[in-house]
A protein has these predicted regions:
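Zn2+-dependent metallopeptidase catalytic core
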Residues: 2-169, 186, 254, 272, ...
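Non-catalytic C-terminal accessory/binding modules of secreted extracellular proteins
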Residues: 3-17, 49-50, 83, 141-162, ...
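Residues at the C-termini of beta-strands that transition into short coil/loop
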Residues: 42, 203-204, 289
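Short intrinsically disordered coil segments
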Residues: 53-58, 214-220, 300-304
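Extracellular hydrolytic enzyme modules, especially secreted metalloproteases
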Residues: 121, 126-274
């Protein structure tokens, strides 16, 4: 089956952190060598006693963070991190700061940057600040709302209180344009419908990014994915971490040429369970809706059973009233690939 190019999804409006194309006024390319700077800041009422070198090793998971991006991108993206060790003290107590609004978050970074007058923050792609109490939050805005800095604007930066490399990966992926897949903001319908299958949904359980996010970032080569609009197709679906073969199938829901919503089929990745990697290999089916903003359920997994047991196995059939196709899983091979039949409705 010849691979067809997947269209850019139509957001049908100005959607913040969409599953469609990244906003070029905020986000840079997700290909190539990226420079990040890691800072350490605390407060008079939240004094950090841990050595910043130890803190840096912990939050990066002794290399887990860098390895994750290198492997998930198939070597197309590397992140070099420069540390500025030593805790710098902010002028007010922790309760006087917040990352909950754009204005308060921006002002927090303005003060943090002032603590480092000799550093040129414009030289870095990503700015990461370790600090207690403020939580884990990524800032990303167009110039009119961006962080003012020496007559310029900085569009993206993050602060992190967690010491999990997967939480840092989640926040870093926000700096790259990905939305939250967990639910907030009073959204009707299922809560956290992407389950443990992507870092943007569950940084504590997921081991990587869904195929769609690898596609969005430009990491998944053209011959590793295909776009099906009609007919019945039998094909071998290879795991995303394989070196060859079709690993992602996309089927449009609403428009063949310029869809805003698609269904995606791929082989599931391992998930984490109590510090162990739990294999749950099978066929994963989910929808992607570019009209929905961060936190509004832009990705929905359609599970075989529950979200922890989402992958379909040999002999299973996926058929749903909302889906533009049906799927039969015919066989699972020793290399983790699956033979499937896709019939577009």
């Amino acid at each position: 089956m010849a691979a067809m190019q997947i269209p850019v999804l139509d957001t049908k409006g100005d959607v913040y952190k969409t599953e469609g194309a990244n906003d070029p006024l905020i986000y840079d390319s997700t290909i190539g060598h990226k420079k990040a700077i890691m800072l350490y800041a605390d407060f008079s009422d939240a004094v950090m006693k841990v050595d910043t070198k130890d803190r840096g090793k912990a939050v990066l998971g002794n290399g887990i963070f860098q390895t994750l991006f290198h492997e998930q991108s198939y070597g197309k993206m590397t992140i070099e991190i420069e540390h500025v060790y030593g805790w710098r003290r902010l002028s007010k107590s922790a309760g006087k700061y917040s990352s909950r609004t754009t204005d308060s978050h921006r002002e927090l970074f303005v003060e943090i940057f002032d603590l480092y007058p000799k550093i040129d923050f414009l030289a870095y792609d990503y700015i990461m600040v370790n600090m207690p109490r403020i939580g884990n939050t990524a800032f990303g805005e167009r110039d009119e709302l961006a962080i003012p800095y020496k007559g310029n604007k900085i569009n993206v930066a993050l602060n992190i209180s967690s010491v999990s490399p997967y939480v840092l990966a989640h926040e870093t992926a926000h700096l790259m344009g990905l939305p939250d897949l967990y639910t907030y903001g009073g959204v009707e319908g299922p809560k956290n419908p992407a389950g443990p299958w992507d870092i943007m949904s569950s940084a504590g359980r997921a081991s990587g990014f869904l195929g769609w996010h690898r596609h969005k970032f430009g990491w998944l080569d053209a011959n590793r994915k295909t776009y099906i609009t009609s007919g019945t197709h039998r094909l071998k679906l290879t795991p995303l971490n394989a070196s060859s073969g079709v690993s992602m199938i996309t089927i449009p829901v609403d428009n063949l040429v310029k869809p805003s919503k698609v269904f995606v089929v791929e082989i599931s990745q391992p998930i984490q369970n109590k510090d162990k990697v739990q294999n749950s290999i099978g066929v994963l089916v989910y929808s992607v809706d570019a009209k929905l903003a961060t936190g509004q359920n832009p990705v929905v997994v359609y599970p075989k059973e529950d979200l922890l047991k989402a992958p379909f196995q040999p002999g299973d059939r996926f058929d749903h009233k909302d889906a533009p196709m049906s799927i039969k899983v015919l066989k699972k091979n020793e290399d983790g690939s699956c033979l499937i039949e896709v019939k577009v409705n």
